[in-house]
Each structure stands twice: as C-alpha cells, then as structure tokens.
C-alpha cells in the first residue's frame, strides 16, 4: 500500500488547493422584470430571452375555473 514518505506541509497543501476556490457568480438585472438572472439565460419569471417571449407560461386550470 502506498504511504507518503514525508509529511506534506501546510504550505504545500494550501498551494495545491489554491486552484479549488469558487468564483463569483455573474448576475445581471433583467430590464423587463427587474429580477436577477444569469446572463445569456432565459428569464425564469416571464420566459423571455433577448426581449422575446420564448417560453409560454403554464396556466393552472384550477385558477381559471
């Protein structure tokens, strides 16, 4: 079984982990709804992309009746 010959120092361990940090999420404010959304993604509130309606909202039959 493989066993390390020398103890890995805290410095070496942290240098190895330096690339594991998460980056910030880039969000923009939707011009039509004012909600936050990811750039180049469909707005989850009204289903628009680039000021065009691309996804129709589902209508609940219970609310209509």
Swiss-Prot record:
The keyword Magnesium does not apply. GO terms for cellular component: large ribosomal subunit. The gene is rpmF. Keywords: Ribonucleoprotein, Ribosomal protein. This is Large ribosomal subunit protein bL32. GO terms for molecular function: structural constituent of ribosome. Gene3D superfamilies: Single helix bin. Belongs to the bacterial ribosomal protein bL32 family. The keyword Ribosomal protein applies. It comes from Rickettsia typhi (strain ATCC VR-144 / Wilmington). It holds the Pfam family Ribosomal_L32p. PANTHER family: 50S RIBOSOMAL PROTEIN L32 (PTHR35534), LARGE RIBOSOMAL SUBUNIT PROTEIN BL32 (PTHR35534:SF1). One of its GO terms (biological process) is translation. Disulfide bonds: none annotated. HAMAP family: Ribosomal_bL32. It comes from the Bacteria.
């Amino acid at each position: 079984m493989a066993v390390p010959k020398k103890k890995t120092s805290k410095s070496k361990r942290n240098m190895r982990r330096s690339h594991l940090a998460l980056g910030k999420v880039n969000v923009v404010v939707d011009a039509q709804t004012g909600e936050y959304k990811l750039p180049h993604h469909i707005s989850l509130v009204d289903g628009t992309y680039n000021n065009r309606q691309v996804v129709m909202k589902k209508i609940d039959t219970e609310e209509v009746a």
